[in-house]
Amino acid sequence: MASPDAEDASPSPEYRSDLDDDMAAEQKTDDGSPSQKSSNGQKPASNAKDPLRPRRKKARRACFACQRAHLTCGDERPCTRCIKRGLQDHCMDGVRKKAKYLHDAPDGALMPGVGGHYPYMNGNRPTPLPSQDTHNVPMAPQGNMYTQAPSGTFYQPPSAQIPLPQAQHGRSFSDQQSPLSPPFSQAHHGPNVNPPSSISQGQPGQMQQFGPLFDPSDPALFNFDISSLNFGNHYGALEFGMLGHMSSAVDAPNDNTMMNAMNQTANMYGPQMAGAYGPNNPNAAMPFAQNSLPAGEWQESQSRQNSMHIHTPTSSATALDHGGHRHDSLNGPHAFAIGQGPSSHSTASPASTDASAFENDNPLSTATFFANTNRGQPQRSPTTNRHHQGNRPPSTALQPIHSNGVRKRHRDTKSIYQGIKKPFDYVKGYHRLFQICHKKFSKSLLAQAQQYLNLYRPVLLSVREEMDTDDLIHQEMGLQRNLMTLQDHFTEVGTPFLICRRSGEIVSCNKEFTILTGWRQDVLLGREPNLNVNLGNSREADESEMSTQTNTTPNLTGQEAETGTPAVNAIQLMDAKSALEYLQNFSELCWQDPHGHAKQRANMLRYQTKADFDRIQEMKANADHKSDAFVKMEGGAVHQGESAMQRLGAKNGMVDCMIWWHIKRDIFEMPVLVCMSVMPVLDKGLQ
């Protein structure tokens, strides 16, 4: 085989195909037959399949020339073959075929040993992002600026010096890179300078402190050397670094100082710009909170992300924001802000500060923060938070998490089991029920009502005779305890409900029932006087309330006088026909069905005072008055909102409803509570 020409050994950067063929021919010459080498007096080559044959060490990455010629390369640079060919000045690692998910990655990032080939890690400035403009952003002249002396090791900023305008007294402004997490305390202060009147936004090294929060081209952001992890992929190591950066929030610091994103000293990036900070100017200081953010951003939740508040001697503060309201991968929130729930460890997010410290003052702090994003939230000072945290017992591995939602209601059962000293007097309750029936029903309906009451009233009296006072007190305790459970259940449902005793006295209702009928709970329970004049016109016109004396229940001589306003009875909330149907259903289900429940259609009377009744009569008498439609749509009136719900039954004073109710019993199998779910019939009520 003829030797290659002399021109092939020229250090030309252009690799031609004839050069690759010559290098392949050279390999064939080196791997000649044993007979050819033995004739020259050399040791014959071993068989390629011989296991004792010495193997060539495989290189991590072939150079560009050996890769094109498909030759075995070495790890040294320049490699042996390029030195032999005279191409040592152009020997560099070849580029492997990219995977689909790495098509957008630069070629330099895929090189082994990123620190020697990626331009930004050599100290050169990276190319500005497309979103950054090159125009000048005017800035109002601030007060005196102070620089800080470096403390500890820090990442070397770009070596290219950017000229800045000279300040007063011939002192120049330092162009050091500002860290992402400024320190909490600043012990050293440099000479005061004045910032320039305008700063070019297209200089990434100059405006690094206002750039993206997570710069994928900054390996020092994640506090380790990516090239030393031997991942073989820069972006794969970057992903692991991001996971480590986020998981660092669960590690509590060893001291009371702040913990930055890398859990090291805050000055690892070098000195930064301090906004008008100095002992002689305390009003223009820029304090930093324990989450390594400026106090302006700590106290003002509405401040944008990636903004730096610089307090001036004047009352105004200049906010430099180049990220706007963007929340993408370049201008996203802090890694510690991913979990907004409370935590027992110190975090670095203003929105995720220790929620347990604000539990008594503001239990819905997180919900209020998201509901009022444009309004500032009051925050306690870091010193106060650390003081409260120091007084707490040491935290364990398992701690209960305090949710920011509706917490479980504390049940005070002591007032039930220790406060009830006497039973409820059902004798007075049924006497009031008979009096209400005489006032509400006509003669024909009153006879039916008395018949329904006689079906279960004697049975209740006979069972009561077998119970002593302690049994009756225990029965009342069970009633109040069941009532507490029912109230907790009904608060989770938006259905209007009503709870009464077996004698009809109201014991509880919810706000939906008040919206539907106008009856407030204080009036129903007898805490306020009942001023209702809407009786439903149940009696006939020729009858008076005191027409006969034989139908009224006589007063018993041994009873105590009434002390206070009694509770409203359930049949007082219905018209005569609906109340009679209720008494009929209760008489049938009181003893016959152990799990008695029924449903009926009823007209509930709205709560109307004398003033309300006069106003309605005046509106009816006015011929020019036209009733307004509640909600006008193509299909007719549609119920919408609480205001429309309050207008149900405004014309005739009755709300057409569907009632589903069931009976709650005690341990003696006696009916004690009647639970009613009231739902309005909207198609009729809104016409």
Swiss-Prot record:
Residue numbers spanned by region Disordered: 1-56, 150-214, 300-411, 536-561
Alphabetized InterPro entries for the sequence: ERT1_acuK_gluconeogen_tf (IPR050335), PAS_13 (IPR056751), Zn2-C6_fun-type_DNA-bd_sf (IPR036864), Zn2Cys6_DnaBD (IPR001138)
GO cellular component, one term: nucleus
Keyword match Metal-binding: yes
Any Pfam family: PAS_13
Superkingdom of this protein's organism: Eukaryota
Subcellular location as annotated: Nucleus
PAS domain location: 482-553
Keywords from the UniProt entry: Activator, DNA-binding, Gluconeogenesis, Metal-binding, Nucleus, Transcription, Transcription regulation, Zinc
GO terms, biological process: cellular response to starvation; gluconeogenesis
DNA-binding region, residue intervals: 63-91
Sequence ranges of Low complexity compositional bias: 195-212, 342-357
Record's compositionally biased regions (Polar residues): 32-45, 150-159, 169-179, 300-318, 362-384, 392-402, 546-561
Gene Ontology MF: a single term: zinc ion binding
Annotated function: Transcription factor which regulates nonfermentable carbon utilization. Activator of gluconeogenetic genes.
Family to which this protein belongs: Belongs to the ERT1/acuK family.
Protein name: Transcription activator of gluconeogenesis SNOG_12336
Record organism: Phaeosphaeria nodorum (strain SN15 / ATCC MYA-4574 / FGSC 10173)
